[in-house]
């Protein structure tokens, strides 16, 4: 496995039929996921962007056992997802408490983890599920800032009119991931 140091985290690739993505860990915990083609690996001379757009370098060149184990675990988990063998993670499996999240973001991400693969909720519905019924716009901001897409499945959140809405650097990923999970656009409003 090709492991890179990025700021205070370590990065390793995971493979999919759509190309390689990157997983980031710090202190043995998942802190970032980049979808294939999303990061700076190919665009910046081999330096992944990292969970916060960081740069390669700094700190120990080799990860400790906890980081190495976490990189291997999460790379395999994401490869299993993209191979169709894994579709969801539970709140107990995702280290939200270690991700420097605010109370609101954590509540929203925990609620989102309960949305089954291939199903969608609107930003407003997710706000209600998280206990913030009037915070649909803030939920949209939390989705845009999600450091671990796919694991915290922000692609399952759509607009109330049934349209996809935005998604990272490439909005096509949202529908691609939903279809991968078995979702069908047939009968969707706004199509």
Residue spans for each PLM region:
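Basic nucleic-acid-binding alpha-helical/helix-turn surface characteristic of O6-alkylguanine DNA
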Residues: 1-133, 184-191
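…primarily DNA-binding HTH/wHTH and HhH modules…
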Residues: 160-191
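Gly/Ser/Thr-rich beta-alpha loop segments that engage phosphate groups in nucleotides
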Residues: 21, 120, 133, 142, ...
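Regulatory, non-catalytic segments
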Residues: 134-149
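Short Lys/Arg-enriched helix C-cap and helix-to-coil transition segments
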Residues: 150-157
């Amino acid at each position: 496995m090709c492991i890179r140091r990025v700021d205070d985290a370590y990065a390793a690739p995971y493979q999919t039929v759509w190309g390689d993505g990157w997983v980031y860990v710090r202190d043995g915990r998942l802190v970032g996921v980049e979808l294939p083609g999303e990061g700076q690996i190919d665009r910046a001379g081999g330096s992944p962007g990292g969970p916060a757009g960081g740069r390669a370098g700094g700190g120990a060149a080799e990860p400790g056992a906890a980081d190495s184990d976490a990189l291997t675990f999460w790379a395999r988990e994401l490869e299993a997802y993209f191979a169709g063998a894994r579709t969801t993670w539970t709140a107990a499996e995702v280290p939200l408490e270690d991700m420097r999240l605010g109370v609101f973001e954590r509540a929203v991400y925990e609620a989102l983890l309960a949305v089954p693969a291939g199903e969608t909720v609107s930003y407003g519905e997710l706000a209600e599920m998280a206990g913030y019924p009037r915070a649909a716009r803030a939920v949209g901001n939390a989705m845009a800032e999600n450091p671990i897409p796919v694991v915290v499945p922000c692609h399952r959140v759509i607009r109330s009119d049934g349209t996809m809405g935005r998604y990272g650097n490439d909005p096509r990923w949202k529908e691609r991931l939903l279809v991968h999970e078995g979702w069908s656009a047939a009968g969707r409003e706004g199509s």
